[in-house]
Amino acid sequence: MADRRYCCLHDFLSRTDEGREWEDILPVRKWLYQTPEQILIKASNGASDFGNKFGQPLICGSVLTFEHTENNEVYGYDKVIMLAGGVGYGTQRDCLKGTPEAGNKVVVIGGDNYRIGLGGGSVSSVDTGRYSSGIELNAVQRANAEMQKRANNVVRALCEEDVNPVVSIHDHGSAGHVNCLSELVEECGGLIDMSKLPIGDKTLSAKEIIANESQERMGLLIKEEAIEHVRKIAERERAPMYVVGETTGDHRFSFQQADGVRPFDLAVEQMFGSSPKTYMIDKTVERHYEMPEYELPKLHEYLTNVL
């Protein structure tokens, strides 16, 4: 079941009618690229279009708006939030990842690399406009519903087999290959052959190849003896499949070019185990707000305002 949910300020409203006090809690602010109204309309259209192309139409959703000011404090969803996803099921057998061994093959299923979706993890976590427009627009992701459906069909076919040949699996999200594939080899290390990665744009730098985000790709760790079997399933589903590396057992994660140069070469513990710890000290602050004033005879008026 696919759905979408939105959280935003009242700014998504058109404000074509004057004198509606409940829309004027906060002053209308200026927006950098798109207004909340434009985002909700375009995101909704895009989500519905993607679901239809994928073959899983959106059948539910919601919109939540909130803004409040009191005691010189302002609360609200200042940044429009869109949550898109789905609800499915899996077997208990497949709920935990397996343990990788040296020699397991690193496989990528899905589309090519392009100069898009760079820095998405960083940009999505800060105020819009903090970085230059070039950085922010480069971070915009892409998704190809047809390609994602093909990759999904391969994964589903493997899950429905009596013996699932997948040792580990991870989707491509922020940071692209460097994030996805490192998750597969976290316990033992791995070497990725960059010449085996599918390149849609020959002008990409090593950083762009390693870190671009394309959400219709999946990373899998497959036992060597099962590679040809998985390849036949991928061919049946017309899903591009690439064997791009293998686990090494040396506890390093590296990307190596055809000339032997490694633009990315780190110990696994540097990526997962030695990051500075962040300590957050919680302090409970009790706040008291005035009860809203209302008159029961005006119930229908209030409903009309909201609807």
Locate the predicted segments by residue.
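Glycine/proline-enriched, intrinsically flexible loops and inter-domain linkers
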Residues: 1-307
